[in-house]
């Protein structure tokens, strides 16, 4: 299958307008970006400045079009500028952007989430995944009266001071152990354990069980690359926390309402005490949520003593985008997402196998990552031990051919339901050259 005329691949000189825009941005924004992974630090080169997105296609400032396999890092399951979402946002925006007062859409979105997630009885809406995580951890400590939190190496839960230790996402991409500015005191009650090692969790609870407020884990990690939990792992976490009176917090910011209509819970129904949501539930707007058992959630102010607040929480425009996205995400959408992921993974694996490059493509539903590795990737250590140095050449070969993959091996690939035959044709054309570039890449010691 070849590319169609309407999907002409980029050609010609370097992305000159993006380069100039990046130069301008660097003069006023640290590093020229507002989230570090966007800077292409892990792959080199100048980040593309995107001016338009429709369906599965991105258009950059130079007018070049790309197949989008990032989907704004996950939220755009329907594709970009989906009419139902655009219409909902336009209608609400015409009536006002923010009121600082309750609106019906907040209740409607909360009810939609609760309807998809059986263990969730109450929802609190916030503005970002980081804010949701910070609030959930505070609530867990307030509810249990304990201080210590267990997190896992390679799992990323936003840029909360206490949870940045050994984190994934941009922290992994930039090879940072944590961050300057995170004090010892802020992280003193954080216990970092290797992911997928349930015995380490048992041993830690045996020593410190009466001090541990909660275990927080990504439902299926996507921030060290996609590294699914071992079978029964989340259920074992549930059993251990329940035995010791600690809470289980499952972070579904990435997986929530993407890998099924009920997120990872729909594939692996482990009833956490608290869940964290973002990305898809906001339809691409800045919104997130945390929710769970009523007994726990009702410790939040104004009902209880655990304080949490936000001027823009429940913003009506963001609520409209999220509600329209979830209502449009029928079962057929999830079937299409799974088919598209199956097709793309098969194409990737065939091209890389034909080229003779070692690779692993671990999956979490319709999310996946590409690691250049002979050995399976099961935790952060094995992700870091992959041939990370092959990825930049692979990435740029795809980008040059008009395919936009994630700009780090430690990030997830995301498909939308809008992927069309022209997009798959573009990918088919691009993959042999990208696989050859990965083979030809040479490791350079730093």
From Swiss-Prot:
The modification N6-(pyridoxal phosphate)lysine is found at residue 279. Its main location: cytoplasm. Its cofactor is pyridoxal 5'-phosphate. GO terms for molecular function: glutamate-1-semialdehyde 2,1-aminomutase activity; pyridoxal phosphate binding; transaminase activity. Its EC number is 5.4.3.8. GO terms for biological process: protoporphyrinogen IX biosynthetic process. Pathway: Porphyrin-containing compound metabolism; protoporphyrin-IX biosynthesis; 5-aminolevulinate from L-glutamyl-tRNA(Glu): step 2/2. Keywords: Cytoplasm, Isomerase, Porphyrin biosynthesis, Pyridoxal phosphate. Gene3D superfamilies: Aspartate Aminotransferase, domain 1, Type I PLP-dependent aspartate aminotransferase-like (Major domain). It catalyses: (S)-4-amino-5-oxopentanoate = 5-aminolevulinate. Pfam families: Aminotran_3. Homodimer. Belongs to the class-III pyridoxal-phosphate-dependent aminotransferase family. HemL subfamily. This is Glutamate-1-semialdehyde 2,1-aminomutase. It comes from Mycobacterium leprae (strain TN). The lineage of its organism: Bacteria, Bacillati, Actinomycetota, Actinomycetes, Mycobacteriales. The gene is hemL.
């Amino acid at each position: 299958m070849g590319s169609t005329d309407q999907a002409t691949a980029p050609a010609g000189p370097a992305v000159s307008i993006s380069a100039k825009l990046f130069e301008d941005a660097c003069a006023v924004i640290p590093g020229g970006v507002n989230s570090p992974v966007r800077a292409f630090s892990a792959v080199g080169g100048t980040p593309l400045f995107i001016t338009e997105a429709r369906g599965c296609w991105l258009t950059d400032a130079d007018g070049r079009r790309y197949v989008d396999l990032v989907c704004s890092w996950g939220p755009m399951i329907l594709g970009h500028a989906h009419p139902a979402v655009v219409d909902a946002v336009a209608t609400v925006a015409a009536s006002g952007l923010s009121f600082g007062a309750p609106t019906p859409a907040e209740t409607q979105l909360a009810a939609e989430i609760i309807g998809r997630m059986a263990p969730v009885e109450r929802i609190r809406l916030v503005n970002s995944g980081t804010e949701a995580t910070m609030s959930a951890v505070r609530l867990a400590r307030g509810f249990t009266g304990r201080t210590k939190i267990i997190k896992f190496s390679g799992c990323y839960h936003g840029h909360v001071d206490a949870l940045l230790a050994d984190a994934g996402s941009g922290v992994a991409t930039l090879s940072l152990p944590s961050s300057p500015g995170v004090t010892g005191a802020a992280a003193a009650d954080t216990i970092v354990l290797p992911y997928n090692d349930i015995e380490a969790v048992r041993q830690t609870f045996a020593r410190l069980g009466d001090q541990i407020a909660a275990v927080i884990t990504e439902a299926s990690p996507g921030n060290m690359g996609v590294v699914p939990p071992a079978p029964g792992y989340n259920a074992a976490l549930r059993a251990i926390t329940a035995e010791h009176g600690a809470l289980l917090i499952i972070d579904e910011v990435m997986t929530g309402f993407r890998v099924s209509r009920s997120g990872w819970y729909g594939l692996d129904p482990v009833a956490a005490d608290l869940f964290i949501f973002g990305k898809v539930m906001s339809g691409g707007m800045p919104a997130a949520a945390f929710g769970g058992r009523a007994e726990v959630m009702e410790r939040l102010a104004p009902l209880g003593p655990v304080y949490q607040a936000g001027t823009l929480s429940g913003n009506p425009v963001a609520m409209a985008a999220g509600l329209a996205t979830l209502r449009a995400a029928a079962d057929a959408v999830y079937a299409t997402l799974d088919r598209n992921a199956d097709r793309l993974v098969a194409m990737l694996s065939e091209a890389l196998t034909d080229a003779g490059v070692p690779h692993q493509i671990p999956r979490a539903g319709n999310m996946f990552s590409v690691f250049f590795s002979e050995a399976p990737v099961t935790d952060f250590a094995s992700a870091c031990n992959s041939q990370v140095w092959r990825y930049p050449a692979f990435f740029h070969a795809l980008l040059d051919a008009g395919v936009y993959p994630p700009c780090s091996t430690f990030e997830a690939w995301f498909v939308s339901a809008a992927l069309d035959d022209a997009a798959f044709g573009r990918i088919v054309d691009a993959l042999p050259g990208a696989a050859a570039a990965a083979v030809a890449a040479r490791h350079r010691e730093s």
